[in-house]
């Protein structure tokens, strides 16, 4: 069964049920989620390609923002991520040098204060006139209230998760009202998870390898496991695969380590860059027919 957290929950339920009825069916979970939020695995297939898309797109947005006049402007980019900010963190890979755009990056792992955000923007204007700010859709006040909920009520999906939209638009209106500068918000939307134009070759290779490992594990009688990725301590990037108990994985959520978040919650540190760079390497030729 291939997928993310809810899929691993399904593997857990099916494998436990099969055991109670003495079924010989084997259930193996293969991780696949751009959210990169599964525990007991270094990362998940899909994240590398999505991170590459985010970094490349934010780079292009930053270039576009820089070509206009020198009047102060803010471009807010809203990126997927309800409780884990892995994808928004990947926007740091768009930078060419220290201080480059995106100047500010906010993740749901750290409580978001709108007043501090405005202060951060004003301080950033001391160094550049064209700011790009990247945010996770799930930025929140630290007490369970999402920033997007400050603007409107939201519904829930079939799994009971709040459906988030509007964090970028809320901050756009806030900046416009309080700072009076040119501002726009951009929601990267579904292309983050479905674009095939910038696939990571590393991501593709590991997805195939983990699927193959999972099939072999099932043929050996393994069940109720997820194929996890383990990064070795070698100087060069290297991954090994191993089955992990899916019951210890489902309904858990891996978030970005707090010590990887810097700038008092408004930036991403070198630890994340070192972690993510190997995952976006290599290109895959996109079929043209």
What label would you give each PLM region?
Residues 1-3, 9-28, 44-184:
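Accessory alpha-helical/coil subdomains and C-terminal extensions
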Residues 28-33, 190:
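Mobile beta-alpha loop/short-helix "lid" or hinge segments that flank ligand
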Residues 35-43:
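Glycine-rich, charge-decorated loop segments at or immediately adjacent to ligand/cofactor-binding or catalytic sites
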């Amino acid at each position: 069964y291939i997928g993310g957290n809810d899929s691993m929950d399904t593997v857990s339920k099916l494998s436990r049920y099969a055991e109670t009825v003495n079924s010989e069916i084997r259930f193996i979970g293969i991780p696949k989620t751009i959210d990169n939020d599964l525990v007991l695995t270094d990362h998940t297939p899909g994240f590398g390609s999505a991170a590459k898309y985010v970094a490349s797109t934010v780079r292009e947005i930053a270039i576009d923002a820089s070509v206009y006049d020198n009047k102060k402007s803010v471009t807010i980019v809203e990126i997927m991520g309800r409780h884990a900010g892995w994808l928004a963190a990947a926007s740091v890979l768009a930078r060419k040098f220290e201080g480059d755009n995106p100047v500010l990056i906010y993740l749901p792992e750290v409580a978001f204060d709108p007043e501090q955000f405005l202060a951060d923007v004003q301080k950033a204007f001391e160094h550049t006139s064209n700011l790009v700010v990247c945010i996770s859709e799930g930025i929140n006040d630290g007490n369970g209230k999402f920033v997007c909920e400050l603007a409107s009520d939201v519904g829930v999906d079939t799994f009971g998760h709040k459906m988030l939209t509007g964090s970028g638009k809320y901050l756009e209106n806030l900046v416009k009202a309080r700072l009076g500068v040119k501002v726009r918000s951009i929601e990267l939307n579904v292309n983050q998870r479905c674009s095939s134009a910038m696939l990571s070759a590393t991501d593709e290779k590991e997805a195939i390898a983990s699927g193959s490992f999972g099939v072999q594990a099932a043929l050996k009688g393994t069940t109720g496991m997820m194929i996890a990725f383990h990064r070795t301590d070698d100087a060069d990037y290297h991954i090994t695969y191993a089955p992990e108990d899916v019951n210890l994985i489902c309904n858990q959520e891996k978030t970005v380590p707090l010590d990887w978040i810097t700038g008092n919650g408004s930036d991403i540190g070198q630890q994340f860059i070192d972690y993510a760079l190997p995952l976006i390497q290599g290109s895959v030729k996109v079929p043209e027919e």
